[in-house]
Design a protein with these regions (language model features):
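Mg2+-dependent phosphoryl-transfer enzymes with acidic/Ser/Thr/Gly-rich catalytic loops
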Residues: 27-34, 69-74, 81-179
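Alpha-helical substrate-recognition element adjacent to the catalytic core
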Residues: 1-82, 179
Length: 179
């Protein structure tokens, strides 16, 4: 890596999910997230990277998933580049020390500015054209984990991230099934 990474910014629909939007009869939205992507996000956080979920859609499931993993979130953001400019500036992080994983046209402005633009395998051609990495996995199917591992490898931090991950308490509870 030319500059140490400080922030990992993730689009949601098409990156953390497969892009499908599920609405029940009451208009409530559900999303499906991949467990391996969650581990990748935790690995990024364990090496001190800020992780932000950035999406144009307003979505309670996105907020819940971000909170569960310890990531930050910004939902209902129409102009991602303007929001991210303020967010990075507020953190004192230059654009070249940020990575962004995207999949569609609304991600292009941000991808052209960050130091580490990444496209998912099933992203549109315009996004792939500006990416330093095109994942082999599609959005919602482990693409974020692949991107995080690639970034960790380039920073020489993968082994340390895995060590820290394995050293954590697992947080599981044990009980007996009801008889």
């Amino acid at each position: 890596m030319t500059a140490p990474l400080e922030a990992l910014v993730l689009d949601v629909d098409g990156v953390l999910t497969d892009g499908g939007i599920i609405l029940d009869s009451g208009g409530r939205e559900s999303k499906r997230f991949h467990a391996r992507d969650g581990v990748g996000i935790r690995l990024a956080l364990l090496v001190g990277w800020r992780v932000l979920f950035l999406t144009a859609r307003g979505s309670i499931p996105v907020k819940n998933r971000a909170q569960e993993l310890g990531a930050e979130w910004a939902i209902g953001i129409g102009r991602k580049e303007l929001f991210l400019e303020e967010w990075l500036e507020g953190m004192g992080i230059p654009w070249e020390r940020a990575a962004f994983v995207g999949d569609d046209l609304q991600d292009l402005a941000v991808m052209r500015r960050v130091g580490w633009p990444i496209a998912v395998a099933d992203g549109v051609d315009e996004v792939k054209a500006v990416a330093k990495l095109i994942t082999t996995r599609p959005g919602g199917r482990g693409a974020v984990r692949e991107a995080v591992e690639w970034l960790l490898d380039r920073a020489g931090l993968r082994e340390e991230a895995v060590r820290r991950f394995l050293a954590q308490e697992d947080g599981f509870s044990v009980g007996k099934p009801e008889q």
